[in-house]
From Swiss-Prot:
Protein name (Swiss-Prot/TrEMBL): Lipoteichoic acid synthase
Organism listed in the record: Staphylococcus saprophyticus subsp. saprophyticus (strain ATCC 15305 / DSM 20229 / NCIMB 8711 / NCTC 7292 / S-41)
Gene: ltaS
Signal peptide (from-to): none
Chain positions recorded as Mn(2+) binding sites: E255, T300, D475, H476
Cytoplasmic side: 1-7, 65-68, 141-153
Keywords: Cell membrane, Cell wall biogenesis/degradation, Manganese, Membrane, Metal-binding, Secreted, Transferase, Transmembrane, Transmembrane helix
InterPro entries: Alkaline_phosphatase_core_sf (IPR017850), LtaS-like (IPR012160), OpgB/LTA_synthase_biosynth (IPR050448), Sulfatase_N (IPR000917)
Taxonomic lineage from the root: Bacteria, Bacillati, Bacillota, Bacilli, Bacillales
Function according to Swiss-Prot or TrEMBL: Catalyzes the polymerization of lipoteichoic acid (LTA) polyglycerol phosphate, a reaction that presumably uses phosphatidylglycerol (PG) as substrate. Is required for staphylococcal growth and cell division process.
Pathway, per record: Cell wall biogenesis; lipoteichoic acid biosynthesis
Compositionally skewed regions (Basic and acidic residues) per UniProt: 580-607, 625-646
Active site: T300
Family as reported in the entry's similarity comment: Belongs to the LTA synthase family.
GO BP of this protein: cell wall organization; lipoteichoic acid biosynthetic process
Length: 646
């Protein structure tokens, strides 16, 4: 018995392996992964999240007997270690985590051999020191092992405890980051809250689901959608068709902007004086006050997706995250193939957020200027990333060097929840609603307005303003229904369901060189932007699959569907199962004659778009006007040295 006490039991070896793999995971969190951990709750989650899957996987091998059990636990621990280390090396180079989608592109590693080698660090032995020790014991010191059968009645207890710990971890994660699994944020979020091993399981489940949906799809499904979208198409306005052919296109994303801010005064001051000027129709802009966002859970990523593809985001999660590997016929790619445009995106956040570094390759976007191209010193950072003024200042310099004609998309950040701005950047007093979110929103919106004005002035100085098509739009609402009481104080009116629907107007400003501005009260949404731009460029759209219609067309369809099933028209809105008159936002006593037709169309638009995404239907489409995008031809390098198409 004394001899047995000195030996290493199977359960002790199990505990040791769980602890060492967990410790290595902690080491990676703080040394190699940049997870942006803040506060007590997130640190507690970080301590918790590796254990559950490590213990659950390794506990399975406790059912085995003798030497086999030791070896299986060792192999299990080694596989987990290898997965961790593979993520470490991948993260050092790509600032992202391995997914099953990226493993399908493993052939690219051969061409990056030098870069992968450069990703090795001197301290990497830490990840394998326990593996070496365990291997030495298993081969040369078997006499140290107690090979007696482990009592299997304890194994279910260990497994149950592991599963319970996972759900506790998930509960903490959901409390700190609601809708974590359904909205599928940046992979860093998922790893921070779930750990690298649970993230791999999650990614595997999502991959299987996506593959199953794709596997069932066929060309007949595509034909149904094409037949539907072709009968939706409208004739272009002759006055505008080709009016901006081969003009530079600058698309400016106003983060979380809502049109109630236009002409709004707080303490006697205009919140957005510059945008107010652009909204008069006297500054060369067509202003669309009845332009709505059509995003779902993907929010910003959905707005990008919808405007560049004229498809809707998914009912759950982000299309960028879940359908990023699909085949697309995007606006920037069409402009490239039809008129030789180069395309770029500029954003003061890191390229992996919302899976942009992968999605943009499938959109055929040539260049991506992410945070690594900007001065990200502490003084220039606010909230999620680079301050808008610094972002626009540096972006203008990059833009001046772009090959023309170009299609450029600039994504701002400062006017983002929780709407904080440093005292030196706050140029308007907060209102006094008692809600820090609503009060802060006024200050960050003013800062955004000032930033935009400075950028426009820079464009004028660089000779890029007058002869460019300029689009300005709000991507999604900033103030949710949770802040209705404060909004009632700010606006001086009740926030009914109909009024909240009105607050989903995010605005669209369109400057067309050589054309006068106006206030256009047409009802429209983000899906309508792509066909509008293509017609302005003089591009025939009959062979492109799009859910929206040309804003400038006399036959524009003014039914605006929303991802939650609501919709709005120029006369009425359908919200939460009730119909409201747009004139007074009062419930309508009689159903409009065209209501059922509009409702069915709205539902079908969403369903057809979902079918395209879930079945990856565009892979079947041999469009005579479009060559399929080859994602492997695009690579987005880390700044500031620039990036070029291969």
């Amino acid at each position: 018995m004394k001899l047995h006490k000195k030996k290493l039991t199977l359960f002790a070896f199990f505990i040791l392996t769980v602890l060492t793999v967990t410790l290595k995971t902690y080491f990676s969190y703080y040394v190699d992964f940049s997870l942006g951990v803040k506060g007590l709750v997130q640190n507690l989650i970080l301590l918790m999240n590796p254990y559950s899957l490590i213990a659950l996987v390794l506990s399975i091998f406790l059912f085995f007997k003798g030497k086999k059990a030791f070896w299986f636990i060792f192999i299990g621990g080694f596989i987990l270690t290898f997965l961790l280390y593979a993520n470490v090396v991948y993260f050092r180079f790509f600032s992202d985590f391995l997914t099953f989608s990226t493993l399908n592109q493993a052939g690219n590693v051969e061409s990056m051999g030098g870069a992968v080698t450069a990703s090795f660090k001197w301290y990497d032995f830490v990840y394998f020191i326990d593996t070496i020790i365990y291997l030495f014991v298993l081969i040369f010191k078997q006499k140290w092992l107690d090979k007696r059968v482990f009592s299997k009645k304890f194994v279910p207890v260990v497994m149950a405890a592991s599963i319970a710990l996972f759900f506790l971890n998930l509960a903490f994660a959901e409390s700190d980051r609601p809708e974590l699994l359904t909205r599928t944020f940046d992979h860093k979020y998922l790893v921070k809250y779930l750990g690298p091993y649970n993230f791999t399981v999650y990614d595997g489940v999502k991959t299987i689901q996506n593959n199953q949906q794709k596997a069932l799809a066929n060309e007949d499904d595509l034909t149904k959608v094409l037949n539907y979208t072709k009968q939706k198409q409208t004739e272009p306005n002759k006055e505008y068709f080709g009016a901006a052919k081969k003009k530079n296109i600058i698309k400016i994303h106003l983060e979380s902007f809502q049109t109630f801010l236009i002409n709004k005064k707080v303490n006697g001051e205009e919140v957005t004086p510059f945008l107010n000027k652009l909204s008069t129709g006297n500054e060369g802009y067509r202003y669309y006050p009845n332009f709505y966002h059509q995003t779902g859970q993907g929010k910003t990523s959905d707005s990008e997706f919808t405007m560049d593809n004229s498809l809707f985001g998914l009912p759950q999660g982000s299309a960028y995250s879940l359908k990023g590997d699909n085949t697309y016929q995007s606006l920037p790619a069409i402009l490239d193939q039809q008129q030789g445009y180069t395309s770029s995106v500029m954003h003061g956040d890191y390229k992996t957020f919302w899976n942009r570094d992968q999605v943009y390759k499938h959109f055929g976007i040539d260049k991506f200027y992410d945070a690594t191209y900007y001065d990200m010193s502490e003084d220039n950072i606010e909230n999620l990333g680079l301050k808008d003024k610094e972002f626009f200042k540096e972006s203008a310099d990059y833009l001046a060097k772009e090959k023309q004609p170009f299609y450029n998309h600039l994504i701002t950040l400062t006017n983002h929840y929780p709407f904080t701005v440093s005292p030196e950047d706050a140029s308007i007093e907060k209102p006094n609603t008692g809600d820090s979110t609503v009060d802060g929103y006024i200050q960050t919106a003013r800062y955004l307005d000032e930033s935009l004005e400075e950028f426009v002035n820079e464009l004028k100085k660089k000779g890029l303003y007058d002869d460019s098509v300029i689009m300005i739009y709000g991507d999604h609402y900033g103030i949710s229904e949770n802040h209705n009481k404060a909004m009632e104080k700010l606006l001086g009116e009740d926030i009914t369901p109909a009024k909240f629907n009105d607050l989903n107007r995010t605005g669209f400003w369109l400057k067309i060189p050589g054309k006068e501005g106006t206030v256009d009260k047409t009802y429209a949404g983000q899906a309508d932007v792509m066909p509008t731009i293509l017609h302005l460029m003089g591009i025939d759209t009959k062979n492109y699959l799009m859910m929206g219609t040309d804003l400038l067309s006399k036959d524009h369809n003014d039914t605006v569907p929303f991802r939650n099933g609501d919709f709005v028209t120029k006369d009425y809105k359908y919200v939460n199962g009730r119909i409201y008159d747009n004139k007074n936002n009062e419930p309508m006593t009689e159903k409009p004659k065209d209501f059922e037709k509009r409702k069915q169309q709205s539902e079908k638009d969403l369903q057809m778009s979902d079918d395209v995404l879930n079945g990856d239907l565009l892979r079947f489409y041999d469009n005579p006007d479009f060559d399929k995008i080859k994602p492997s031809e695009y690579e987005y390098k880390t700044g500031p040295k620039g990036q070029e198409r291969k």
